[in-house]
From Swiss-Prot:
Subcellular localization: Cytoplasm
Disulfide bond listed as a keyword: no
Keyword field: ATP-binding, Cell shape, Cell wall biogenesis/degradation, Cytoplasm, Ligase, Magnesium, Manganese, Metal-binding, Nucleotide-binding, Peptidoglycan synthesis
ATP-grasp domain residues: 132-334
Function recorded in the entry: Cell wall formation.
Binding locations of ATP: 162-217
Native source organism of the sequence: Streptococcus thermophilus (strain ATCC BAA-491 / LMD-9)
Binding residue positions for Mg(2+) 2: E301, N303
Pathway the protein acts in: Cell wall biogenesis; peptidoglycan biosynthesis
Protein name in the entry: D-alanine--D-alanine ligase
One GO cellular component term noted in the UniProt record for this chain: cytosol
Amino acid sequence: MSKQTLILLYGGRSAEREVSVLSAESVMRAVDYNAFEVKTYFITQSGDFIKTQEFIETPGDDEKLMTNDTVEASQAIKPSDIYEEDAVVFPVLHGPMGEDGSIQGFLETLKLPYVGTNVLSSSVAMDKIMTKRILEVAGVPQVAYTGYIEGEDLEAAVAETLEKLTFPVFVKPANMGSSVGISKAENESELRSAIDLALKYDSRILIEQGVVAREIEVGILGNTTVKTTDPGEVVKDVAFYDYQAKYIDNKITMDIPARVPVEVMTQMRAYAAKAFRALGGCGLARCDFFLTEDGAIYLNELNTMPGFTQWSMYPLLWENMGLSYSDLIKELVVLGQEMFDKRESHLI
């Protein structure tokens, strides 16, 4: 039986490129090499495409994907050179220029099927402010928030925040993930400093009401038919679940399934599917919720390319549902091909 080519894109231009490499290495080891051969391409911080390794069998434990320290300029290619007939692309890219519709539009221009959400849902879900506005209309509960866009009246934004929210608040770049650039502010001075920090990563800033809550996550899989997982819980060993704790120090543990009442579990799964559909989602996503002591549920964010390392919540949630990491990858490829075929059929 001939194998299908699975193209892994990893690295990228965003601050989350380290996570991308870890995710891609996990995917390359979990792939069923009876069904796929894998070709990998590293995207540098400057946006260059580098042809890296190819695998026809499971790589050894010490095999690492090539990155900035090991690639050579002679390996650089034109981005369009990744095209291969009958291949499917898995863009294991997190954050801006990877998860925001940019790479998805590029792949659609090349007529390449790909894993994950389409251009529209990727770009909307990447922007936390736009996501909030759409989910408000859809009736999905969220914590109170304000926003600031660079160039607008900063003093007015601070005043609105002081009026509508109470400290502590969380200040986030609207278009970043993995806790990059996020700060907790306990007073007005810290709020202003947090806005300055967030502006280094984005020109659109979300300011959210801080809540004392458990962090519960639900996996989503599907196109027209949407499946969800039982929730899992992030059990933090640090005060703030930041990028360093999440990916570098690994100072978190997870309870899968989360220890929550059945009615809470059911409601979260319903909200997750509702949010996914409201944003036009397809392929996959992870929906992150807050659960307060009084039982209130708030949707925090919807991540269209969640971490894919062997210790990441998304694949572990599906393993708990009986879908192995390897079979999850197969299912994502099928869903990606299905969406590609549908897009092509609409071009009449």
